[in-house]
Amino acid sequence: MSLNEKIRHYRIKIKNMGFVAAVGKSIDYRLDCFVMWFAKQIYAKTPLLDTIVLESHNDFDSNGGAFYDYLIKKGYNKKYKIVWMLNNPKPNDLPENVEGYYIYKPSFRKAYHLCTAKYLLSCHFIYGSVREGQKSGYLTHGSISLKKTSGNINLPDEINFVLTPSEFIAPIVADNFGIPYPDKRQIIIGFPVHDTFYNDVPGDLGKVTGNKYNKTILWMPTFRKSMDLNRDDSNGELPLGVPILRDMESCKALNDFLERENALLIVKIHPMQDLSTIKIQGMSNIVVLDRNSIKRLD
């Protein structure tokens, strides 16, 4: 990262978080690196434990969340300690043998688990193996990306495997993640979230609305401008913060169409999107959800 990029990066952080919070986060990061280094020296030769470390984009969601749900449903938390690396406050009702630690705050206990766990699985903040003998995997988040991300995501050599949905998409995944193709680390078995579409559990639409619709459409545009990654992935002007819809008049026309068809459109804003850019508003047949409202629904 060049000096100008670093300056821009910190300006964005200060704008989004405030000066004191931005400085505090920077200090926490450096302390966390030191604690992690210190823990590596202590636990480099100790036995690996039956621990699974999980991380996902917005905690308990995406592929990490789907895999976690599977582990709990099948009772694997009785054999394995499950440790979550969290972006948000830890829930008070975690199941037996499940712990959570804030991903960006220094914690010797967190470092201990990272150094002694047999498995490290991540969706967003990529954890590679910390020491020999560990198995680490990148589960990815969302579906496969429909935008070119090569150069923005580079999987570390310490990652043992990356999930891939099909042979056809494998070279695209490799290019997006900065790994050679072919690469034996690519495992073509689909994603844990795919299982959600093949179960008999009723959906969660009732948490969003009590109305009945002929059709429900879920639109999940990827982020254009991130809140803290110093990235702006769109050169186009987006007055409402999302593509396609140019102004509130077009939203009103779309809402009128949905109303005539008795259809609901759910616009799910990407968790990393800078919410200050989002101007689209909910209407009778349009619901707008972001990372904060999703957590409130849970």
Predicted features by range, described:
Residues 112-114, 155, 210, 257, ...:
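Structural alpha-helical scaffold elements that stabilize or flank donor/cofactor-binding regions
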Residues 99, 153-154, 180, 203-204, ...:
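Short secondary-structure boundary/capping segments
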Residues 1-50:
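Membrane-proximal basic amphipathic "stem/tether" segments
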